[in-house]
Amino acid sequence: MTTVLTTHHHWDHAGGNQKLLELRPDLHVIGGDDRIDALKQKVTQGDQVKIGNLNILCLFTPCHTTGHICYYVTDEENGSKAVFTGDTLFLGGCGRFFEGDGAQMNEALNVKLGALPDETVST
C-alpha cells in the first residue's frame, strides 16, 4: 500500500489513517479537507493524481461534508473506469446533508457525477 484516497473526514472513512501511517510511515494520504487525519496532500476540483497505472481525477462534491472529494479513476492499461463516491452517492440514494445544502448536492450528483461516462462503475 502506497496511497490512501480519503473522501472525507468522518471517522468511518478517515478514522484509520493515523494508525496506517504509524504502520507505514511512507504512506501518502490524500483528501480534500484539512480535518482528515494524517492528510499529506490536499486536493480539490480538477486535481489529478497518478498511482501506478491509475489516473485519478478529483471531483469536489461538498454537501455531506464541506471538503468531500469523489475520485474518478481510469486504468490506463485496460481503460476501465470507476468513481469512488464516499458518502455522496449510495446504491439507494445520496448521503445526508451534514455541512451542505440541496444546491450543492444537486451540483455533485447531477452535474459532476452525472457527467461521467455511462460505463463508469460506482463504488
Which ranges hold each PLM region?
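Active-site HxH/HxHxD metal-binding segment of metal-dependent hydrolases
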Residues: 1-60, 74, 81
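Catalytic core of the metallo-beta-lactamase
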Residues: 39-123
